[in-house]
Amino acid sequence: MSGIWHTDDVHLTSAGADFGNCIHAKPPVVVVPRTVADVQEALRYTAARNLSLAVRGSGHSTYGQCQADGGVVLDMKRFNTVHDVRSGQATIDAGVRWSDVVAATLSRQQTPPVLTDYLGTTVGGTLSVGGFGGSSHGFGLQTDNVDSLAVVTGSGDFRECSAVSNSELFDAVRGGLGQFGVIVNATIRLTAAHESVRQYKLQYSNLGVFLGDQLRAMSNRLFDHVQGRIRVDADGHLRYRLDLAKYFTPPRRPDDDALLSSLQYDSCAEYNSDVDYGDFINRMADQELDLRHTGEWFYPHPWASLLIPADKIEQFIETTSSSLTDDLGNSGLIMVYPIPTTPITAPFIPIPHCDTFFMLAVLRTASPGAEARMIASNRLLYEQARDVGGVAYAVNAVPMSPGDWCTHFGSRWQAIARAKRRFDPYRILAPGYRMSFD
Protein backbone atom coordinates (compact mmCIF):
# COMPACT_ATOMS: atom_id res chain seq x y z
CA MET A 1 0.00 0.00 0.00
CA SER A 2 1.27 3.49 -0.85
CA GLY A 3 1.25 6.52 1.38
CA ILE A 4 2.14 6.24 5.06
CA TRP A 5 -0.04 3.90 7.12
CA HIS A 6 0.07 4.13 10.91
CA THR A 7 -1.32 1.60 13.36
CA ASP A 8 0.71 2.53 16.44
CA ASP A 9 -1.00 3.85 19.54
CA VAL A 10 0.56 7.33 19.38
CA HIS A 11 -0.84 8.12 15.94
CA LEU A 12 -4.17 6.43 16.60
CA THR A 13 -4.70 8.28 19.88
CA SER A 14 -3.88 11.60 18.22
CA ALA A 15 -6.33 10.90 15.38
CA GLY A 16 -8.99 9.98 17.92
CA ALA A 17 -9.02 13.47 19.42
CA ASP A 18 -9.57 16.99 18.15
CA PHE A 19 -9.47 20.59 19.36
CA GLY A 20 -12.88 20.21 20.97
CA ASN A 21 -11.69 17.37 23.21
CA CYS A 22 -15.32 16.37 23.78
CA ILE A 23 -15.40 13.21 21.63
CA HIS A 24 -12.64 10.59 21.48
CA ALA A 25 -12.86 7.80 18.91
CA LYS A 26 -9.57 6.07 18.15
CA PRO A 27 -9.42 4.57 14.63
CA PRO A 28 -7.61 1.31 13.78
CA VAL A 29 -5.54 3.01 11.08
CA VAL A 30 -4.31 6.46 10.05
CA VAL A 31 -3.29 7.05 6.45
CA VAL A 32 -1.03 9.96 5.50
CA PRO A 33 -1.30 10.29 1.70
CA ARG A 34 1.46 11.91 -0.33
CA THR A 35 -0.21 11.80 -3.74
CA VAL A 36 -3.69 11.79 -5.23
CA ALA A 37 -3.19 8.09 -5.97
CA ASP A 38 -2.62 7.50 -2.25
CA VAL A 39 -5.94 9.19 -1.48
CA GLN A 40 -7.69 7.04 -4.07
CA GLU A 41 -6.15 3.88 -2.67
CA ALA A 42 -7.22 4.75 0.88
CA LEU A 43 -10.79 5.34 -0.26
CA ARG A 44 -10.94 2.07 -2.19
CA TYR A 45 -9.40 0.19 0.73
CA THR A 46 -12.04 1.67 3.02
CA ALA A 47 -14.95 0.89 0.69
CA ALA A 48 -13.81 -2.69 0.07
CA ARG A 49 -13.85 -3.39 3.81
CA ASN A 50 -17.11 -1.57 4.53
CA LEU A 51 -15.33 0.91 6.79
CA SER A 52 -15.76 4.66 7.14
CA LEU A 53 -13.22 7.41 6.43
CA ALA A 54 -12.78 10.86 7.93
CA VAL A 55 -10.49 13.53 6.55
CA ARG A 56 -8.28 15.36 9.03
CA GLY A 57 -6.55 18.67 8.41
CA SER A 58 -5.34 20.39 11.56
CA GLY A 59 -7.89 18.57 13.75
CA HIS A 60 -9.66 21.79 14.73
CA SER A 61 -13.15 20.28 14.84
CA THR A 62 -15.00 20.53 18.14
CA TYR A 63 -17.21 17.43 18.32
CA GLY A 64 -15.46 14.54 16.61
CA GLN A 65 -16.23 15.66 13.06
CA CYS A 66 -12.74 14.66 11.86
CA GLN A 67 -12.80 11.27 13.62
CA ALA A 68 -13.70 7.81 12.32
CA ASP A 69 -14.68 5.40 15.07
CA GLY A 70 -13.55 1.97 13.84
CA GLY A 71 -12.62 3.41 10.45
CA VAL A 72 -9.81 5.21 8.65
CA VAL A 73 -8.54 8.73 9.33
CA LEU A 74 -6.97 10.36 6.28
CA ASP A 75 -4.39 12.84 7.59
CA MET A 76 -3.76 15.47 4.88
CA LYS A 77 -0.66 17.04 6.43
CA ARG A 78 1.58 16.01 3.50
CA PHE A 79 -0.67 17.91 1.06
CA ASN A 80 1.04 21.10 2.16
CA THR A 81 2.29 22.90 -0.96
CA VAL A 82 1.40 26.37 -2.18
CA HIS A 83 1.79 25.71 -5.89
CA ASP A 84 1.26 29.09 -7.46
CA VAL A 85 0.45 32.66 -6.47
CA ARG A 86 -0.49 34.91 -9.36
CA SER A 87 -2.56 38.04 -9.86
CA GLY A 88 -5.96 37.42 -8.32
CA GLN A 89 -5.53 33.69 -7.62
CA ALA A 90 -3.53 31.09 -5.72
CA THR A 91 -3.46 27.32 -6.22
CA ILE A 92 -2.79 25.43 -3.02
CA ASP A 93 -3.02 21.96 -1.53
CA ALA A 94 -5.87 21.19 0.85
CA GLY A 95 -3.59 20.46 3.80
CA VAL A 96 -1.95 23.90 3.74
CA ARG A 97 -2.73 25.99 6.79
CA TRP A 98 -4.14 29.44 6.16
CA SER A 99 -1.18 30.97 7.99
CA ASP A 100 1.07 29.53 5.28
CA VAL A 101 -1.31 30.70 2.56
CA VAL A 102 -1.10 34.31 3.71
CA ALA A 103 2.66 34.09 4.16
CA ALA A 104 2.90 33.16 0.48
CA THR A 105 0.34 35.65 -0.81
CA LEU A 106 1.51 38.64 1.21
CA SER A 107 4.94 38.29 -0.37
CA ARG A 108 3.07 39.17 -3.60
CA GLN A 109 1.05 41.94 -1.91
CA GLN A 110 -2.15 39.90 -2.12
CA THR A 111 -4.51 38.30 0.39
CA PRO A 112 -7.55 36.03 0.49
CA PRO A 113 -10.60 38.30 0.84
CA VAL A 114 -12.02 36.29 3.77
CA LEU A 115 -9.96 34.79 6.58
CA THR A 116 -11.16 33.06 9.72
CA ASP A 117 -9.95 34.49 13.03
CA TYR A 118 -7.65 31.53 13.62
CA LEU A 119 -5.23 30.78 10.78
CA GLY A 120 -4.12 27.36 12.05
CA THR A 121 -6.93 25.62 10.20
CA THR A 122 -6.39 24.12 6.74
CA VAL A 123 -7.71 25.15 3.36
CA GLY A 124 -9.58 21.89 2.86
CA GLY A 125 -11.02 22.07 6.34
CA THR A 126 -12.65 25.49 6.11
CA LEU A 127 -13.77 25.02 2.50
CA SER A 128 -15.61 21.91 3.69
CA VAL A 129 -17.66 23.86 6.24
CA GLY A 130 -17.91 27.48 5.01
CA GLY A 131 -15.33 29.75 6.59
CA PHE A 132 -16.70 32.90 8.27
CA GLY A 133 -14.56 35.93 9.06
CA GLY A 134 -14.66 39.61 9.92
CA SER A 135 -14.83 40.53 6.23
CA SER A 136 -17.76 38.21 5.45
CA HIS A 137 -20.10 41.23 5.42
CA GLY A 138 -18.42 42.21 2.17
CA PHE A 139 -17.19 38.97 0.61
CA GLY A 140 -19.32 36.15 1.98
CA LEU A 141 -17.62 32.97 3.17
CA GLN A 142 -14.37 31.37 2.11
CA THR A 143 -16.48 28.92 0.09
CA ASP A 144 -17.69 31.91 -1.96
CA ASN A 145 -14.13 32.84 -2.86
CA VAL A 146 -12.86 29.63 -4.44
CA ASP A 147 -12.69 29.29 -8.23
CA SER A 148 -11.99 25.58 -8.63
CA LEU A 149 -11.31 22.42 -6.67
CA ALA A 150 -9.59 19.11 -7.26
CA VAL A 151 -11.50 16.34 -5.50
CA VAL A 152 -11.34 12.60 -5.01
CA THR A 153 -14.94 11.45 -4.67
CA GLY A 154 -16.07 8.81 -2.23
CA SER A 155 -15.95 6.25 -5.04
CA GLY A 156 -12.26 7.03 -5.60
CA ASP A 157 -12.58 9.09 -8.79
CA PHE A 158 -10.36 12.14 -9.27
CA ARG A 159 -12.20 15.14 -10.68
CA GLU A 160 -11.54 18.82 -11.16
CA CYS A 161 -14.58 21.00 -10.70
CA SER A 162 -15.69 24.61 -10.82
CA ALA A 163 -18.83 26.65 -11.41
CA VAL A 164 -18.64 25.80 -15.14
CA SER A 165 -17.16 22.28 -15.08
CA ASN A 166 -18.54 19.45 -12.92
CA SER A 167 -20.56 22.14 -11.18
CA GLU A 168 -22.71 19.65 -9.25
CA LEU A 169 -19.62 18.30 -7.49
CA PHE A 170 -18.26 21.83 -6.97
CA ASP A 171 -21.49 22.92 -5.30
CA ALA A 172 -21.69 19.75 -3.22
CA VAL A 173 -18.15 19.86 -1.88
CA ARG A 174 -18.09 23.57 -0.95
CA GLY A 175 -19.50 23.54 2.55
CA GLY A 176 -20.55 19.91 2.11
CA LEU A 177 -19.03 18.78 5.43
CA GLY A 178 -16.78 16.26 3.71
CA GLN A 179 -19.75 14.08 2.75
CA PHE A 180 -19.03 13.80 -0.98
CA GLY A 181 -15.30 13.80 -1.55
CA VAL A 182 -11.81 14.65 -0.36
CA ILE A 183 -10.59 18.08 -1.42
CA VAL A 184 -6.95 17.72 -2.47
CA ASN A 185 -6.34 21.08 -4.13
CA ALA A 186 -8.02 24.47 -4.43
CA THR A 187 -7.67 27.59 -6.53
CA ILE A 188 -8.81 30.53 -4.43
CA ARG A 189 -9.35 34.19 -5.18
CA LEU A 190 -7.03 36.91 -3.98
CA THR A 191 -7.37 40.65 -3.61
CA ALA A 192 -4.77 43.38 -3.21
CA ALA A 193 -3.39 43.53 0.33
CA HIS A 194 -2.93 46.84 2.10
CA GLU A 195 0.11 47.40 4.29
CA SER A 196 -1.61 48.57 7.47
CA VAL A 197 -4.77 48.29 9.53
CA ARG A 198 -6.34 50.91 11.77
CA GLN A 199 -8.31 49.33 14.59
CA TYR A 200 -11.25 50.78 16.49
CA LYS A 201 -12.53 49.01 19.60
CA LEU A 202 -15.81 50.61 20.61
CA GLN A 203 -17.50 49.99 23.96
CA TYR A 204 -21.27 49.77 24.50
CA SER A 205 -23.54 49.30 27.48
CA ASN A 206 -26.76 48.92 25.46
CA LEU A 207 -27.31 45.75 23.44
CA GLY A 208 -29.68 47.31 20.91
CA VAL A 209 -27.31 50.18 20.13
CA PHE A 210 -24.40 47.73 19.86
CA LEU A 211 -26.25 45.56 17.34
CA GLY A 212 -27.59 48.57 15.45
CA ASP A 213 -24.11 49.99 14.98
CA GLN A 214 -22.96 46.65 13.62
CA LEU A 215 -25.71 46.71 11.01
CA ARG A 216 -24.82 50.31 10.19
CA ALA A 217 -21.13 49.42 9.79
CA MET A 218 -22.08 46.48 7.58
CA SER A 219 -24.39 48.54 5.37
CA ASN A 220 -22.20 51.58 4.81
CA ARG A 221 -19.23 49.39 3.79
CA LEU A 222 -16.80 51.90 5.30
CA PHE A 223 -14.98 49.22 7.30
CA ASP A 224 -13.09 46.19 6.04
CA HIS A 225 -13.56 44.19 9.24
CA VAL A 226 -16.67 44.11 11.44
CA GLN A 227 -16.97 41.90 14.53
CA GLY A 228 -18.71 42.25 17.86
CA ARG A 229 -17.89 40.48 21.08
CA ILE A 230 -19.65 40.02 24.38
CA ARG A 231 -18.03 39.31 27.72
CA VAL A 232 -19.18 39.19 31.32
CA ASP A 233 -17.62 41.66 33.75
CA ALA A 234 -16.69 40.95 37.37
CA ASP A 235 -20.20 41.97 38.49
CA GLY A 236 -21.89 39.57 36.09
CA HIS A 237 -23.03 42.25 33.64
CA LEU A 238 -22.77 41.86 29.89
CA ARG A 239 -20.28 44.16 28.20
CA TYR A 240 -20.30 44.76 24.46
CA ARG A 241 -17.41 45.71 22.20
CA LEU A 242 -17.46 46.38 18.48
CA ASP A 243 -14.15 45.72 16.73
CA LEU A 244 -13.81 47.59 13.46
CA ALA A 245 -10.85 47.84 11.13
CA LYS A 246 -9.95 49.91 8.10
CA TYR A 247 -7.17 48.75 5.79
CA PHE A 248 -4.85 51.31 4.25
CA THR A 249 -1.46 51.86 2.68
CA PRO A 250 0.57 54.93 3.73
CA PRO A 251 0.86 57.78 3.03
CA ARG A 252 -2.94 57.69 2.75
CA ARG A 253 -4.57 57.24 6.14
CA PRO A 254 -8.16 56.70 7.33
CA ASP A 255 -10.33 59.66 8.27
CA ASP A 256 -11.40 58.71 11.79
CA ASP A 257 -14.16 61.29 12.07
CA ALA A 258 -15.75 60.28 8.78
CA LEU A 259 -15.63 56.60 9.69
CA LEU A 260 -17.04 56.91 13.20
CA SER A 261 -19.45 59.84 12.92
CA SER A 262 -22.58 57.72 12.42
CA LEU A 263 -21.87 55.31 15.30
CA GLN A 264 -23.34 55.67 18.79
CA TYR A 265 -20.74 54.00 21.02
CA ASP A 266 -20.17 54.91 24.66
CA SER A 267 -16.40 55.10 24.50
CA CYS A 268 -13.47 53.97 22.40
CA ALA A 269 -11.08 51.64 24.22
CA GLU A 270 -8.60 51.67 21.36
CA TYR A 271 -8.53 54.49 18.86
CA ASN A 272 -6.19 55.32 16.05
CA SER A 273 -4.27 52.09 16.67
CA ASP A 274 -2.33 51.05 13.57
CA VAL A 275 -0.80 47.62 13.03
CA ASP A 276 0.76 45.74 10.17
CA TYR A 277 -1.82 43.89 8.05
CA GLY A 278 0.00 40.58 8.48
CA ASP A 279 -0.01 40.97 12.26
CA PHE A 280 -3.70 41.85 12.25
CA ILE A 281 -4.89 38.80 10.34
CA ASN A 282 -2.69 36.53 12.47
CA ARG A 283 -3.78 38.20 15.71
CA MET A 284 -4.74 34.88 17.33
CA ALA A 285 -1.18 33.53 17.22
CA ASP A 286 -0.07 35.10 20.51
CA GLN A 287 -3.28 34.05 22.25
CA GLU A 288 -2.74 30.48 21.08
CA LEU A 289 0.75 30.49 22.59
CA ASP A 290 -0.64 31.79 25.88
CA LEU A 291 -3.37 29.15 26.00
CA ARG A 292 -0.91 26.40 25.18
CA HIS A 293 1.31 27.66 27.99
CA THR A 294 -1.54 27.67 30.54
CA GLY A 295 -2.83 24.33 29.26
CA GLU A 296 -6.29 25.66 28.36
CA TRP A 297 -5.64 24.94 24.68
CA PHE A 298 -5.84 21.23 25.51
CA TYR A 299 -9.03 21.45 27.60
CA PRO A 300 -12.46 20.62 26.16
CA HIS A 301 -13.88 23.35 23.90
CA PRO A 302 -17.64 22.77 23.60
CA TRP A 303 -18.23 25.62 21.17
CA ALA A 304 -21.55 26.53 19.59
CA SER A 305 -22.05 28.66 16.47
CA LEU A 306 -25.51 29.73 15.38
CA LEU A 307 -26.87 31.87 12.55
CA ILE A 308 -29.74 34.07 13.78
CA PRO A 309 -31.97 36.35 11.66
CA ALA A 310 -31.08 40.00 12.23
CA ASP A 311 -34.60 40.90 13.35
CA LYS A 312 -34.46 38.19 16.04
CA ILE A 313 -30.92 38.58 17.36
CA GLU A 314 -31.55 41.16 20.12
CA GLN A 315 -34.43 39.23 21.66
CA PHE A 316 -32.53 35.96 21.29
CA ILE A 317 -29.52 37.29 23.21
CA GLU A 318 -31.75 38.82 25.89
CA THR A 319 -33.79 35.65 26.45
CA THR A 320 -30.82 33.29 26.41
CA SER A 321 -28.26 35.50 28.14
CA SER A 322 -27.79 33.22 31.14
CA SER A 323 -27.23 30.18 28.93
CA LEU A 324 -24.94 32.15 26.63
CA THR A 325 -22.72 33.46 29.40
CA ASP A 326 -22.53 30.45 31.71
CA ASP A 327 -19.00 29.12 32.06
CA LEU A 328 -17.31 31.65 29.76
CA GLY A 329 -14.43 31.97 32.23
CA ASN A 330 -11.34 34.06 31.59
CA SER A 331 -10.66 32.97 28.01
CA GLY A 332 -14.23 32.52 26.75
CA LEU A 333 -16.29 35.02 24.83
CA ILE A 334 -19.28 35.40 22.54
CA MET A 335 -18.70 36.58 19.01
CA VAL A 336 -21.60 38.25 17.20
CA TYR A 337 -21.51 39.98 13.82
CA PRO A 338 -23.82 40.60 10.85
CA ILE A 339 -23.62 39.06 7.39
CA PRO A 340 -25.85 39.73 4.38
CA THR A 341 -27.15 36.62 2.65
CA THR A 342 -26.54 37.87 -0.91
CA PRO A 343 -22.80 36.97 -1.18
CA ILE A 344 -23.34 33.40 0.09
CA THR A 345 -23.60 31.09 -2.90
CA ALA A 346 -22.63 27.57 -1.77
CA PRO A 347 -26.02 25.79 -1.95
CA PHE A 348 -25.44 23.19 0.78
CA ILE A 349 -24.71 25.72 3.53
CA PRO A 350 -28.03 26.46 5.29
CA ILE A 351 -28.59 30.09 6.24
CA PRO A 352 -31.67 31.82 7.67
CA HIS A 353 -34.39 32.98 5.28
CA CYS A 354 -33.73 36.71 5.57
CA ASP A 355 -31.63 39.47 4.05
CA THR A 356 -29.16 39.67 6.96
CA PHE A 357 -28.30 37.31 9.78
CA PHE A 358 -25.87 37.37 12.70
CA MET A 359 -23.20 34.82 13.38
CA LEU A 360 -23.39 34.08 17.11
CA ALA A 361 -20.49 31.98 18.36
CA VAL A 362 -20.32 30.92 22.01
CA LEU A 363 -16.67 30.04 22.65
CA ARG A 364 -16.26 28.28 25.99
CA THR A 365 -13.49 26.26 27.58
CA ALA A 366 -14.45 23.51 30.02
CA SER A 367 -12.47 21.94 32.80
CA PRO A 368 -11.93 18.26 31.96
CA GLY A 369 -15.11 16.41 32.85
CA ALA A 370 -17.31 19.53 32.88
CA GLU A 371 -18.04 19.62 29.16
CA ALA A 372 -21.27 17.57 29.31
CA ARG A 373 -23.22 20.39 30.94
CA MET A 374 -22.04 22.86 28.30
CA ILE A 375 -22.91 20.47 25.48
CA ALA A 376 -26.42 20.16 26.92
CA SER A 377 -26.59 23.96 27.05
CA ASN A 378 -25.48 24.09 23.41
CA ARG A 379 -28.26 21.74 22.44
CA LEU A 380 -30.83 23.96 24.14
CA LEU A 381 -29.42 27.05 22.43
CA TYR A 382 -29.63 25.27 19.09
CA GLU A 383 -33.29 24.41 19.66
CA GLN A 384 -34.05 27.98 20.72
CA ALA A 385 -32.29 29.30 17.62
CA ARG A 386 -34.26 26.94 15.42
CA ASP A 387 -37.49 28.22 16.98
CA VAL A 388 -36.75 31.78 15.78
CA GLY A 389 -35.70 30.80 12.27
CA GLY A 390 -32.02 30.30 13.01
CA VAL A 391 -29.77 27.47 11.91
CA ALA A 392 -26.57 25.91 13.18
CA TYR A 393 -23.21 26.55 11.58
CA ALA A 394 -22.22 22.90 11.44
CA VAL A 395 -18.92 23.09 13.32
CA ASN A 396 -20.62 22.79 16.69
CA ALA A 397 -20.37 20.71 19.81
CA VAL A 398 -24.09 20.04 19.50
CA PRO A 399 -25.53 16.50 19.45
CA MET A 400 -27.47 16.03 16.20
CA SER A 401 -29.71 13.09 15.32
CA PRO A 402 -30.33 11.98 11.72
CA GLY A 403 -33.70 13.71 11.98
CA ASP A 404 -32.01 16.90 13.13
CA TRP A 405 -29.85 16.85 10.01
CA CYS A 406 -32.92 16.54 7.80
CA THR A 407 -34.41 19.55 9.57
CA HIS A 408 -31.09 21.41 9.41
CA PHE A 409 -30.86 21.10 5.62
CA GLY A 410 -34.59 21.50 5.05
CA SER A 411 -35.47 21.68 1.36
CA ARG A 412 -31.83 20.93 0.50
CA TRP A 413 -31.99 17.43 1.98
CA GLN A 414 -33.19 15.65 -1.15
CA ALA A 415 -30.42 17.24 -3.23
CA ILE A 416 -27.88 16.28 -0.57
CA ALA A 417 -29.11 12.68 -0.56
CA ARG A 418 -28.85 12.55 -4.37
CA ALA A 419 -25.32 13.95 -4.25
CA LYS A 420 -24.40 11.38 -1.60
CA ARG A 421 -25.64 8.54 -3.80
CA ARG A 422 -23.75 9.90 -6.78
CA PHE A 423 -20.41 10.87 -5.25
CA ASP A 424 -20.17 8.63 -2.18
CA PRO A 425 -22.24 5.57 -3.15
CA TYR A 426 -20.67 3.41 -0.43
CA ARG A 427 -21.49 6.05 2.21
CA ILE A 428 -18.05 5.93 3.76
CA LEU A 429 -17.18 9.62 4.15
CA ALA A 430 -17.39 11.91 7.18
CA PRO A 431 -18.94 9.55 9.76
CA GLY A 432 -18.29 12.04 12.58
CA TYR A 433 -21.37 14.05 11.62
CA ARG A 434 -23.60 11.02 12.27
CA MET A 435 -25.89 11.57 9.30
CA SER A 436 -28.02 8.77 7.94
CA PHE A 437 -28.83 8.28 4.26
CA ASP A 438 -30.78 5.03 4.62
UniProtKB/Swiss-Prot annotation:
Q: Name one GO molecular function term.
A: FAD binding
Provide the residue positions that the database annotates as binding FAD.
55-61, 65, 117, 122, 128-132, 183, 393, 430-433
Q: Which residues carry this modification: Pros-8alpha-FAD histidine?
A: 60
FAD-binding PCMH-type domain span: 23-193
What GO biological process terms are annotated to this protein in UniProt?
Answer: cytokinin metabolic process
Induction trigger:
During the interaction with host plants.
Superkingdom, natural source: Bacteria
* Keywords associated with the record: FAD, Flavoprotein, Oxidoreductase, Plasmid
In terms of InterPro entries, this protein maps to: Cytok_DH_C_sf, Cytokinin_DH_FAD/cytokin-bd, FAD-bd_PCMH, FAD-bd_PCMH-like_sf, FAD-bd_PCMH_sub1, FAD-bd_PCMH_sub2, FAD-linked_Oxase-like_C, FAD-linked_Oxidoreductases_BP
Q: Which cofactor does it need?
A: FAD
The family this protein is said to belong to:
Belongs to the oxygen-dependent FAD-linked oxidoreductase family.
State the protein's purpose: The FAS-operon encodes genes involved in cytokinin production and in host plant fasciation (leafy gall).
- For this entry, the protein name equals Uncharacterized oxidoreductase ORF5 in fasciation locus
- What species was this sequence derived from? Rhodococcoides fascians (Rhodococcus fascians)
Q: What is the lineage of its organism?
A: Bacteria, Bacillati, Actinomycetota, Actinomycetes, Mycobacteriales
